[in-house]
Amino acid sequence: MHNELAHLSAYLPAIAASSPIVEGKIGPYIDNRLNFYKLCYKEVPSIVGDIIPEYVSSFEQYKKEVIGGYSIDLAKKGAAKELLDKEWMNSRGLMFRFCRSALELRILDEQECIKSDVAFSCFIRAVLRGLLSKKCEPVSHSILVSDLNSIIQNGLNATVNHPQGETARQVCLYFFKLAYENATKSEKKYLWIIKKRIEEGSISELIRGRVLNKAKTSSFKEAILSVYSPLIECLSENKPYF
């Protein structure tokens, strides 16, 4: 399941990006959060790796190559022994949490409302069922990393190298079809949110476009306040932002 989720995780930011504004200005990326996320670990890059986790075939391989890898680098930097060989030091977009018998997904930048959080959970579970049942040839890790970097920059319109599409939007529509085919009845009630997000744009893309449009007739600060006010209401009223 880890490897299938690693595959999917490269494309989730295209739908979930929510951080278009940086210090009161339109940021250079669709997903500015993930760009800064990479930069936070420049002193010990192996802690975050390529954000997309490496494929592994066993827990032993994961512990040796991933946890062991960044622990060696931390030791070279003089880190205290209490920080070495700890799973919680791993900051990839997906990681094992052995203490919880779980996989933790950090790559999402979803900041909308609880209903949308549930929609993403339903979508991810259903896609995983489909990927596990299809047992497809995995997309290479290098392609996933390249596609993620393109998505961080350009969102759903990013050019990608996935076998199911030339753009992130096309790949996400493929995943949506797979999700719908494998979703439970209760999960399907939430999937319309994901479908509409893929069709109309991530929160970041919507906010970016609306702020730039408002800024044509008002100050940039006023434009930001005008656009973000309805988003605040979405959180308090538990409704998706479209």
Describe these PLM feature segments.
Residues 2-5:
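Short amphipathic alpha-helices in soluble, non-transmembrane regions
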Residues 7, 14, 18-242:
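C-terminal accessory/tail domains of diverse enzymes
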